[in-house]
Every structure is written in structure tokens, then in C-alpha cells.
Amino acid sequence: MAEVLEKVTKIIVDRLGVEESKVTLEASFKEDLGADSLDVVELVMELEDEFGVEISDGDAENINTVGDAVKYIEANA
């Protein structure tokens, strides 16, 4: 989990320009990290590329926090 979290954190920091300390498993992309809908779509696409997974639109709608993303990747990568 730590390796996946590290990669996800780096992508979020690079994409959203937030401080690494704000990226926690409980952090909401929109509410805590200031992402808008387009940011979330771009994050999902980048996660797909980085981890070689395909995240359906339905699944993407359920990925609201950093922890959700990490759990999804671990279960599907």
C-alpha cells in the first residue's frame, strides 16, 4: 500500500499543486484538495496510465478520496 500511496501522492501533488502534507488517505479530492471536476477526470486518466488499470466512469464516480483511489488501484492493478 505504501508504494501505491507514494505514487498516487506524487501524481496529486504534481497535478493539483497542493502540499504533500495535505494528501492523506482521508483527503477528499474536491473538498480538501481543491480539485474541480476536470481535475478529477485528469487525475483518473493519469492514475490509469501510471498503474495500467482502466477505471470505468461508474467506478471513477465512487473515487472521492485519496484512500478510495489507493484501494481501487490495489484491487485492480
From Swiss-Prot:
Cystine crosslinks: none
Subcellular location, record wording: Cytoplasm
Signal peptide (from-to): none
PTM text: 4'-phosphopantetheine is transferred from CoA to a specific serine of apo-ACP by AcpS. This modification is essential for activity because fatty acids are bound in thioester linkage to the sulfhydryl of the prosthetic group.
Main subcellular location of this protein, as a coarse class: cytoplasm
Molecular-function GO term, any one: acyl binding
Residue ranges annotated for the Carrier domain, each copy included: 2-77
Functional summary from the UniProt entry: Carrier of the growing fatty acid chain in fatty acid biosynthesis.
Protein name: Acyl carrier protein
Gene: acpP
